[in-house]
Amino acid sequence: MARHHYGQGDYRYFGYPLPEPVAALREAFYPPLAVIANGWQESLRREPRFAPTLAEFIAHCHASGQQRPTPLLLRYEAGGWNAMHQDVYGDVAFPLQVAILLSRPGPDFEGGEFLLLSQRPRAQSRGEAVALSQGDAIVFPNADRPGPGARGPVRWATRHGVSTVRTGVRMTLGLIFHDAR
């Protein structure tokens, strides 16, 4: 991460074929999240709509030249952190993703809260820190989300990251649903 100025830590993307547990989680999460994503698209008056199955959506990614899988493992040692960022890897992007904490807060690490920052139009940014337990999954926007506006839903730009790990080692599984170029 440091050489790209993304933070301090290590990340590794999985290749195809994905490990069975990772593929199974991605398959299970996608359909209900596609319903939410399509609701977001509708509320923001956007196209396209997302396919009901992950296989159909991945086929669309591949047809658009995005063929590299994006699920990854993230590892942060004491002093490690992840800069506030968005995960969009091409023209085709699914608006939600999932992070699953694999380590145990306390025995394995301290610090390392999951961070979300939403930029509301014509207003100050709003940040939230989320303390996860081992095995917890958080679903969050990869780039933006609908938020309340004076005349109906508006686009709120959103970034995510990880605060500094004070002690130990924090491991996370990241499930991004669109493939990359």
Please annotate each region the language model reported.
Residues 1-181:
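Fe(II)/2-oxoglutarate oxygenase catalytic core
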